[in-house]
Regions:
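Alpha/beta enzyme core
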Residues: 1-178, 182-189
Length: 189
């Protein structure tokens, strides 16, 4: 399907390669916790070589953000990001760092080689307005902002995913806060 979409349009096409890697692993073994980091990077490179223009990659979920989430406690909306859920399950079971964060130079090398825009996913976005801009989400934004700066210094274009569910009166102040924290990195909502 992806190849046919790429052939049918001149528009920039984006993917979330973690989904393909996770689903393929689940089909083979029955669980995302069996996913191999090398397989995830193979999927990323394969999609980049096919001509994907941007990829949503969840680098901001790491041991630090998961510890922040744990200390914070209950979230009304839980963890609503599919990519965030896959990575959290994988990290907790395997007691390992997120390979997308841990092997950041490898990821950036692929993005640069194929001129793919790195879209930093928000795996801890709020699933309910009650959780908007909570500590875990802010911690992920800090990590994503650091990754964005690191990638840009290495010649990779980036965008950062927006906030998730917030009340309408929080949008402007939230956007200003995120722009300030990320050194004015481009966001999309």
């Amino acid at each position: 399907v992806r190849r046919r979409v790429l052939e049918a349009t001149k528009l920039t096409v984006g993917t979330v390669p973690l989904y393909e890697a996770a689903i393929e692993t689940i089909r083979k073994t029955g669980s995302v916790i069996d996913m191999e980091a090398d397989f995830l990077f193979e999927v990323i490179e394969k999609q980049a070589a096919e001509g994907i223009g941007f990829m949503a990659i969840h680098c901001g979920i790491n041991r630090i953000t998961l510890e922040r989430l744990k200390r914070q406690g209950y979230r009304f909306g839980g963890l609503v990001s599919r990519g965030g859920s896959f990575l959290t399950a994988w990290m907790n079971h395997n007691k390992k760092e997120n390979p997308l964060y841990d092997q950041l130079d490898r990821l950036i090398g692929i993005m640069k080689k194929y001129d793919v825009i790195l879209s930093l996913g928000n795996g801890l976005r709020a699933g309910a307005v009650h959780d908007s801009t909570d500590r875990a989400q802010i911690q992920e934004l800090i990590i994503n902002s650091e990754v964005a700066e690191y990638a840009q210094k290495r010649g990779v274009q980036i965008i950062i995913e927006g906030t998730g569910n917030i009340t309408i009166d929080e949008i402007e102040s939230n956007d200003k806060k995120k722009k300030r924290m990320s050194n004015n990195a481009p966001f999309y909502m």
